[in-house]
Amino acid sequence: MTANAQQLQFIKDSIETIPDYPKPGVLFRDITTLLDNPLAYQATIDLLVERYQGKGITKIVGTEARGFLFGAPVALRLGVGFIPVRKAGKLPRETLSETYNLEYGTDTLEMHKDSVRENDKVLVIDDLLATGGTVEATVRLIRRLGGEVSEAAFIIGLLGLGGVERLQRQGVSSFTLLEFPDH
């Protein structure tokens, strides 16, 4: 097993699976146990930094709230700015908004209008890719400001829920450290 494969297995083992949460039949992947393990958390950040070092990234965008936990330390290590994308009404300056569909309704994300500039090369980081609705709205915000989305990175990808395909339809490549079945 390579060093990276060992790190990935260590990270995967640090994520607890909670059956029947938030509803029966769902296996919830709980990253709080990864965050509580400083060695696993550090290994996660290290692998992301290793992947994106020297790739010309100028900004990292993290989506509320768990995207902040991974995006900000990677941005710090890469020496680039970190941009939070938040739920509507949480940012103090002038914002752009994108509304997207959820299973039972809609939600709205916002980012500051001056956070991404024309030709910024942006990496989106979030904890989990499932259906891809949140990241799709985030990509639309970045593009409306003139930024180029270089890739979207996730700690966990849930297979079979269509998130990767949704990003591909937008012309965005994705990267996941770990993949789990969708159930």
Curated annotation (Swiss-Prot):
Record's subcellular location: Cytoplasm
Reactions accelerated catalytically: AMP + diphosphate = 5-phospho-alpha-D-ribose 1-diphosphate + adenine
The gene coding this protein: apt
GO annotations of cellular component type: cytoplasm
Protein name, entry field: Adenine phosphoribosyltransferase
GO MF annotation, one: adenine binding
Keywords annotated in UniProt: Cytoplasm, Glycosyltransferase, Purine salvage, Transferase
Membership in a protein family: Belongs to the purine/pyrimidine phosphoribosyltransferase family.
